[in-house]
Amino acid sequence: QADPKTFYGLM
């Protein structure tokens, strides 16, 4: 499960 918040946070 990949959350968008985590994706942006990683960026």
From Swiss-Prot:
Organs and tissues of expression: Expressed by the skin glands.
Keywords in alphabetical order: Amidation, Amphibian defense peptide, Neuropeptide, Pyrrolidone carboxylic acid, Secreted
Disulfide partners: none
Residue numbers bearing the Pyrrolidone carboxylic acid modification: Q1
Subcellular location: Secreted
BP terms from Gene Ontology: defense response; neuropeptide signaling pathway; tachykinin receptor signaling pathway
Transmembrane portions of the chain: none
Primary residence: secreted
Pfam families: Tachykinin
Methionine amide: modified positions: M11
Keyword Plastid: no
Gene Ontology CC annotation, any one: extracellular region
Keyword rRNA-binding applies: no
Highest taxon, organism lineage: Eukaryota
Record's function text: Tachykinins are active peptides which excite neurons, evoke behavioral responses, are potent vasodilators and secretagogues, and contract (directly or indirectly) many smooth muscles.
Family membership: Belongs to the tachykinin family.
The protein's name in its UniProt record: Rugosauperolein-2
